[in-house]
Amino acid sequence: MSAAGRGLSVDLCTDEAAFAALAGEWEGLHASCPSATPFQTHAWLHSWWLSYGTPEGLRLFLVRRGDRLVGAAPLMSVRRPVPRLVPIGGAISDFRDVLLDGTAAEEGGRALAGALAAAARTSLVDFRDVRPGSAVEQVYRHWRGPRCRLRDSTCLELPALPMAELIKRLPTARAQRIRNKVNRLGRLGVEWRVVGHDETETSVRRLIELHRLQWEGKKVTPEHTRPRFVEHLARSVVPMARSGQAAVTEFLLEGTVVAVNLHLRSGGLTGEYLYGFHPRLRDSKVDVATMLLRAASEVAATGEGGVLSLLRGDEPYKYRWCPRTVHNERLLMAGPLTAPLLAASVSHATARRTAKKVLRGRAGDRAHG
């Protein structure tokens, strides 16, 4: 336990059983953190740890005011390519962050910065995929050692409006094409529903099977086919759906489920996480993107307003909806002894970004050559 000033204390938890026991407190903190996303819920993070965590790697920094949890940095220790403290959740989580109670954001951020500075004597603190306005920006602001922020992943966002309102935002010709596609869904008899809590696990497993069928014979994200990913989704989404932090929609054609979509929700954010559909929809000339977004927009519109996030990736098909581009950041923080690790990581990231630009430029030249 370390003193943090102004009545706050910071405790480092490395015990998996203690992490599991934090569920109730954690969800209270999550609800009081304005910037929290679904990827910071206890259900998501603890389930992720059960599937992906490494022995003795857990590093939970817990900020308390008396007995009340007012801040948390869910991190883990990794050794490669350099010693780092990174957020739990890994690459399958679209946003990484800490949690700070809205009534203690300033002092909580300062307390976490102090605790992480001690840890940074031997490890680089590395936050990828930081959404603008995230709580970890408070930690970064109070950091007294070497630090750097880099542009990271791209997300596309739409306002949380019903489909009819989203269509009104589009250019006239494109809006009419979308209306025609929506009308075709009706003529074909495509229906959709949000599944009940007791059906969630079965529906999630059906989603994965349809996702495999959808990508059969094509290049699929390997992790989406691995048992640990399937078990993580089934384990985490059930309690999240029960608490309103997730929703699963099924699409039916002639009484058969032909597609499933998973939405993750928190506050004013609804994120489109993963979907799967049967290839027969292609044979029926169903516009799958329109089908999915029609249901997603209705799910998002029933929330607290805010945004419908298409999450990471700027695939061309997403731009038909005229989304807003949001750039996530990477926040790197070090101490005097780990400053060389920060410099090496920044150089590596810069080199990768430059190489990608060069490759894109060559691809563009070939396309127009």
PLM features per residue range, with description:
Residues 56-58, 120-122, 246, 303-305:
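Short, high-confidence coil segments that cap the C-terminus of an alpha-helix
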